[in-house]
Each structure stands twice: as structure tokens, then as C-alpha cells.
Amino acid sequence: MYLTASSSASSSIIRAASSRSSSLFSFRSVLSPSVSSTSPSSLLARRSFGTISPAFRRWSHSFHSKPSPFRFTSQIRAVSPVLDRLQRTFSSMASEHPFKGIFTTLPKPGGGEFGKFYSLPALNDPRVDKLPYSIRILLESAIRNCDNFQVTKEDVEKIIDWEKTSPKQVEIPFKPARVLLQDFTGVPAVVDLACMRDAMNKLGSDSNKINPLVPVDLVIDHSVQVDVARSENAVQANMELEFQRNKERFAFLKWGSTAFQNMLVVPPGSGIVHQVNLEYLGRVVFNTKGLLYPDSVVGTDSHTTMIDGLGVAGWGVGGIEAEATMLGQPMSMVLPGVVGFKLAGKMRNGVTATDLVLTVTQMLRKHGVVGKFVEFYGNGMSGLSLADRATIANMSPEYGATMGFFPVDHVTLQYLKLTGRSDETVAMIEAYLRANNMFVDYNEPQQDRVYSSYLELNLDDVEPCISGPKRPHDRVTLKEMKADWHSCLDSKVGFKGFAIPKEAQEKVVNFSFDGQPAELKHGSVVIAAITSCTNTSNPSVMLGAGLVAKKACDLGLQVKPWIKTSLAPGSGVVTKYLLKSGLQEYLNEQGFNIVGYGCTTCIGNSGEINESVGAAITENDIVAAAVLSGNRNFEGRVHPLTRANYLASPPLVVAYALAGTVNIDFETEPIGKGKNGKDVFLRDIWPTTEEIAEVVQSSVLPDMFRATYESITKGNPMWNKLSVPENTLYSWDPNSTYIHEPPYFKDMTMDPPGPHNVKDAYCLLNFGDSITTDHISPAGNIQKDSPAAKFLMERGVDRKDFNSYGSRRGNDEIMARGTFANIRIVNKLMNGEVGPKTVHIPSGEKLSVFDAAMRYKSSGEDTIILAGAEYGSGSSRDWAAKGPMLQGVKAVIAKSFERIHRSNLVGMGIIPLCFKSGEDADTLGLTGHERYTIHLPTDISEIRPGQDVTVTTDNGKSFTCTVRFDTEVELAYFNHGGILPYVIRNLSKQ
């Protein structure tokens, strides 16, 4: 039988709660004794599939915040054979919600009610009043979803007692309100869901059980490339090429939007996922059939954190973790510490939000916030616009935090109105958050909140700056930039070094560009891109860039024609206000024509640079530069030929494009010669804060947001012409090079395989620090001599049609070949040789990483990876775990892991191990030429989260590592060979 949303047990919860006793009592009186969720029998049961079943969210999801051509209304039918089995047990739980005593009505001013909600103040517990606002969202979710089954009263108590429990690394379940996807990560997610349906079929179960049970929004934004720039026709030309390359992927996603319930797909050309989420999709407060609760979201993109600026709890997770969340599996997470970041004062004239976020990133990176929430507060908050806050929240992955959270205040409400949310919706949001003590009013005295640690920044101290040349947290002030650049040229190859000999540093390369003389030097800018949701969501810096362009035009400055300039807004709203202000005209004159609505250069979709420019760089070993308003600048990410990549505000992107080089001191050196040969300095073209505020006030209007988003799901003619089958099971084309059935569930049975042995494994790769997911699974161009290129050419794909690795993530055969294919990767086994190769230890041959991995795999040999600190930092890229798994990697031993990547490794059945503090491969004398045995118990009941394990080598070395299975649920996943097999077996048993 199936229960529809209207007939589900949730209605009985509401009915029972509405007749609750009017008396309010303390939290401790709500709790009743029950079996501990951490008892040995409970833990053992959790590791088998019989006890943990997915959550069945029974609320229908409707979004009423603004006029819209559609509603987010689920047509969910909860997968419910399990309810037949547990009906008698759950019937009493449904009518007797553990917290029915705090379920109350939120009245409307003037009569009526907004709905009902679980009241945190009604707990009458003083500990709640001191909780950080971000933790209150976790608390409300736990209370609302408490069923003493998936979420227990003990879990609720852990969160309430956060001050004492968070230092102990306790585990809690969390059930986000929705899931957010983009197409690079969304395609493999939908591929996995389709493959899971097939697996359910093969196991004799109902394939329709594989359906999202929470709202899923997928925005197609990662596919557009800057093939055409500096042209009025660039948007249309790039979109046509985008559809030519990605027609099959887009049709697959369109099929997914019809085959899977509760899934919305926003067509290409609409904007960047995080900006669309901020301006439109974000609810702040859900009103679902009269039940009010805070919006929360997990997304398959690490910059999902941008929504934290709106007061919505959100962060990035791996694709496989998101898939489990879609299917009702609660997320298991360690209750995080919260860093309180106090902002004081006000930014000086001419300083931008980008300067602020780069400063904050450097401070937090130094403080150490991995696995923690950061919550901003202080009197400096009142001077930050919502867009400024979103910029800071966006870069949470760059400073290492799970979230960079800004509680809702009056600035948030003003932004909601600006972006077209209805007055009634905003009134409901404010009333709910005030009633539940989740609203901050900086005009009122602030109650002290407890944080795990504290930081403070006086906004007066923020200086204009950029970050680079290879990492987002390597901030350089503008006044120090020239000296820092020369230091980078001098220093040995590393994060801040290129090792260019002194005698070669002033080299000038002359070449011909379109028949005109041109020249390049070390530091010459060849790409200047206003890109990324980080900054294009912020009208002040976008209009500031337009003002810089206007002043430059007025003074007679012009960007050199061989610099590839581009502007890619995160939503159509940006185009509207740039046109209304009249500033787009001047950006066009400087070459910053709009090229498309998507991520573009920020994720490596910068397109080709001119052949003559490329030849001048490669033939003369020039360290060319890219300057972009993005959030990441890791090696090889922006473009293969730009070894120096700097993050800057949009106005500075225009300024550096005008200067043509990063080798400049803007305070003392002119940008160029203007009219009549007069020197023009940065100060001559830099707008004042008042100038920017004036144009923002006159040009950014609510009607622009309404007009843009009323038509966002209608698509364009190319999207609407895509025809898709109506089948709920996907018909795999074995010859497709975009969509391929992955082998994850091949030969799968109902019996969990248990922990796998790692005995006498070879080291596939030996890495140093800061190996990113871009190194592990690049998203950009497919190099012509790579294993992936060979695979495509063997199947008749021309080089011009290779597309990017990111666009090929629906094909496991290509992605396995693209794993560790970054051309800038440094493997210690190669003794200084840079590139995607390794040594096959038994033969001593130098091979591509893929070829070596396949040789090990074909001979039945396990492999492991050695790594340094921050392994897997960067994008939340599940292929950085899927790829190694398909290559046969059984374990990664590192000094430390980035949060999302560690979770992804666990999700794919790979063992993450950490060296003990003060130790690493070098200090232990490990070269990677040894064979490794990991002495992990083969009985899952004998493994504990975070336990120590001994690793031995064939040459007699022995050392201790910490197993980074952090929770009991992760051990259950490991027992099943990964999270997806675990979910399939669970659903098949019901």
C-alpha cells in the first residue's frame, strides 16, 4: 500500500498537537526514559540493514513566497511497505509526538494564523537561549523530526546541551528540508538514481521506491563555456555550442525531471545555481500544509554555503550523500563547534566586499575552522548588505568551514522584499523567526551567546587586496602586490613560487595578434573574467566594475585586444540593472560583453585563448596570469596556460585588464596612457562608495527580480525542443559517451560484503599537502594525449567535441580515466616530474595513473594512496571518490582530509586513515615503494568510530593511524560497501 501526503501519519500529529495541553513545561519533563541509542545492541543493529530505514517525509512541499508559474508541490507517495510492518508501533508515536507539548500556533496580526510550529522558547530551558543561531536550526529540525526511531529524544538533548557535547564529537542525525544540485554533480546523481532503480528491479523489489522524498532543485549552470567573447552575439553563440555539446546530457536531465517525483530542473541559460538559490529558491521559512519550519538545504556543490548569507542553513555534501538524503536517509553528522566571528566598525571608502571576504578567508584559514560552523555577529553587521554577507558565506569552503552563517535580521527581510518575495511571505518569515528566537534585532540589546572560540575583525582595517597566485587564502594587499609578484618569480616551485631565473624575469615576447604587434611578459594578463556567483550576486561590485569601465573610457584607456575578457552574470537580473544603469555599454567597450549565464571561467570553462597568444606562452615558458572574480584559483583550474591566477573584485578585474599585467603597483604606477598621453592611475578610475550606492539605489529594482524569475522554468526554444521518453526506467545506450550505466551494483546481492581487507597493497600515488579535488578529478579540458582522450577518439569523437571532464561525469568509463589526470599534479613517486603519471612499482615503468591502476587491478593487487594535509580540499566532487574506487584504491592515508571528501570516500567504501599528529609519510620514512597492510578487523562489530589501527609495510615498518569512520552510520555504510548499496538493501527489505 502507499500513503499519500494527505493520508499520512503527519496529519494525525498535527491533530493531536492542536489539542495539546496549554501548560508549558521544561524540556527535561518532556523526556521520558528510553533505551539508549548508543547501547551496544543498538550500535550493532545500526550496522546491519534491518534497523535503520529511510525517513518518510510526509509533508507536501509548496512554495508560496512569490508569484510563480509553478509550485514546488510534491506528488510524493511515501515508500511504505515498512509501515505495514511497523504500523502498530508508529501509530501511537504519530498521535503522541514526543514534543507535542511545544507545538503551538503562530497568530497573524489582525486575526487568523500563519500556521503551527514547534516552539523553542516553550522548552523553558535556559541552555537554548545561549545556543548559536545556527545550532538552533539543528535543534528545531531534531525536535520536529523526533520519532524515537531515526531521531531520538537523546539526539535532541545532545543539541540542547551543545556547549558540553560539541567538544566530545558526538553524532547527531540531521534531515535537511531540501536538496540542491547543479548539472556537473546532478548528472551523476541522476545516473545513480536511475542505476539504483535497475538494481532494485534485479533484486526483485519495486524500482519506484527510488524517488526523492524532499524537494530537489537542479540548476543547469556548469556546461556553458566561453567559446565566443568580445561579441554582442556571444550569449547566443555560446548557448548554441553548449546545446550541441550537451544535448544528450540535457535530455537526460529533462527525463529525470519527469521520471522522478519532486524534482525541479531549471534549464540552461537561467543563471548560477547559488545565485538562483539566493534570489529565488531560498524559502527562509517553509510553510508546508500549515507546518512552519526553517529552510535548510544540502547541495552537491561546495558553495551551497552562499545561502547561509540569507539565514538559511546550507552546506555542500557529496553527490552520494545527497542521493541518500533525497531518499529519506537522515544525514549523520558530528555536532559541530561554532566559531563566533565578531564584525565591528565600517569599511573604508573604496573597499569592496571582495576585499572583505579575502581578508576573512585568510583569518579563518589561519584560525582553523574545518568541520565547524562560523557565525557572524556584532555591530559591524548593520553596515553589510545581504549581498556582502552572501559573498562571505559563499567562500566558506575556501576558509574550511562547514557554514559561514548570518542569522536573519532586518537587512535579510529588506533583501527578500527586493528580490520579489511577497509582503505576506516576508511577514510570515519575520513572525515565525521572532516567535522561535531565531531573529536578530541589532536595535535591541543582544543576549550573550556561547561560542566554541572567538575571532574579531574591525572592518576599518580591511584593505583592497587580491588572492593568489595558486590558492584562495593567499591574500596580497594591492600595495604589496608588485613585491609579492617578484617574490613568486624568485621562489622555488610551490604555492607561492615559479622558480624563474633572474635573467629571464624581464623577458619580453613579441608576437603578432590579428596582424597587429603584441607582447607578453611574465605576469601579463591573458584572461580577465567577471564571473562566479561569489561576486555577480552583489550589485555594488558589479555596478562598481561598470563605473570603472566608464571612467576608463572617458579617460581614453582601452583593454588590449589579446586579453580574453568576459562577463558571465549569475542571473538575468544582473543584465537588467547593468542595462538600466547604462554601464553595460562601457563594459562592452572594454571587451566585457556578456558571454552567458553560468559558471564559466570560475570552474575552468574559460574556453580556448587565441592560438597566437597560446603559442607565445608555451614556446617561451611565460608565466601568464588570469584575473577573475571567482572563488578558486587552484593550479590548472582556470586555464591550462595560466600558471598565475588571482581572485579579485569585479572592479579590480577591469583594472588589471586595463593594466595588462599583475606586475604593477597601483599606488605609484599608472595603469596606462589616456587622452593626450596623460598618465592614468587606479585612483583616477576608482568609484567612491557614494557613487556606487547611488547607482545601486537607482538601478536595482524589485520588478527586475519578479520579471526574471516568473519565466525561469520556461526555458528557451532549444530546451523546449528536447524530446524525452516517458519511461520511469532509463534505457541505457551502451555507445553513449555521456551517459553510461555504472558498475557500482554489478553482481550485488542482499548480503552486505563486510569490511574489506587491505593486504600487501601497492602505493598508487604519493602526494604532498593540499591535493584538491581538482587534482583528483579535474573538471576542465580533456587533454589530447590523456587516457580519456584516447578512449573518446577510439569511439569516433573528434577532439573539438571532447567537451570537459565535468560534462562527462555521467560516463564512468571516461571519469575513471580522468581520475588523477590534472596536468599540474605532483606525485612524489615521479621524482619531481609534474603531470598525471606514476610508477608501476613491480615493473618500474612510468605509466599514466589510469594505466598503472588498471595493471594493478588486473593482477588482483590492492592499492592505497599516501597524502599530506588537506587532502581533497576544494569542490564537493563525488567523482574524486568514485574515480579512485573504480581504479581499485582501497584506502587513503593522509595527514588530514577535507570534510566533504572524507565523507565521499566513506560513501564509496574507501578507508580514510589519518597519520598521528606530528607524523606523515616523510617523517616515517615512507617512500611509496613499500607494500602496505592495514590491520583492520574483518568483523564490523569490532570496529569503532575513530579507533586506532596499525599499518605495516613489507620492509618492517609499523605505524599507527586513526580510522576516519567518524560515526556509527558510516561504519554501517562501510559494512555494505558504500552508502548507495546500503540504501538499496534497506529499501529492498521493506
UniProtKB/Swiss-Prot annotation:
Catalytic activity: citrate = D-threo-isocitrate
Transit peptide residues according to the UniProt entry: 1-78
Keywords recorded for this protein, A-Z: 4Fe-4S, Cytoplasm, Glyoxylate bypass, Iron, Iron-sulfur, Lyase, Metal-binding, Mitochondrion, Phosphoprotein, Transit peptide, Tricarboxylic acid cycle
Enzyme class: lyase
InterPro entries: AcnA_IRP_Swivel, Acnase/IPM_dHydase_lsu_aba_1/3, Acoase/IPM_deHydtase_lsu_aba, Aconitase/3IPM_dehydase_swvl, Aconitase/IRP2, Aconitase_4Fe-4S_BS, Aconitase_4Fe-4S_dom, AconitaseA/IPMdHydase_ssu_swvl
Pathway recorded for this protein: Carbohydrate metabolism; tricarboxylic acid cycle; isocitrate from oxaloacetate: step 2/2
GO CC aspect terms: chloroplast; chloroplast stroma; cytoplasm; cytosol; mitochondrion; plant-type cell wall; plant-type vacuole
DNA-binding is among the record's keywords: no
Induction remarks: Transiently induced during germination.
Consequences of knocking out this gene: Reduced cytosolic and mitochondrial aconitase (ACO) activities by 25 and 55 precent, respectively. Increased tolerance to oxidative stress mediated by paraquat, a superoxide-generating agent. Delayed early seedling growth, altered assimilation of acetate feeding and elevated citrate and malate levels.
EC number annotated for this UniProt entry: 4.2.1.3
Compartment(s): Mitochondrion; Cytoplasm
Record-listed [4Fe-4S] cluster binding positions: C533, C599, C602
Free-text tissue specificity from the UniProt record: Major aconitase isoenzyme in young seedlings. Expressed in roots, leaves, stems and flowers, and, at low levels, in seeds.
BP-aspect Gene Ontology terms: citrate metabolic process; glyoxylate cycle; isocitrate metabolic process; response to abscisic acid; response to oxidative stress; seedling development; tricarboxylic acid cycle
NCBIfam families associated with the record: aconitase_1, PRK09277.1, PRK12881.1
Complexes and interactors: Monomer. Interacts with B'GAMMA in the cytosol.
Job of this protein: Catalyzes the isomerization of citrate to isocitrate via cis-aconitate. Contributes to oxidative stress tolerance. Modulates cytosolic citrate metabolism during lipid mobilization. Required during seedling growth.
The name this protein goes by in its record: Aconitate hydratase 3, mitochondrial
Annotated organism of origin: Arabidopsis thaliana (Mouse-ear cress)
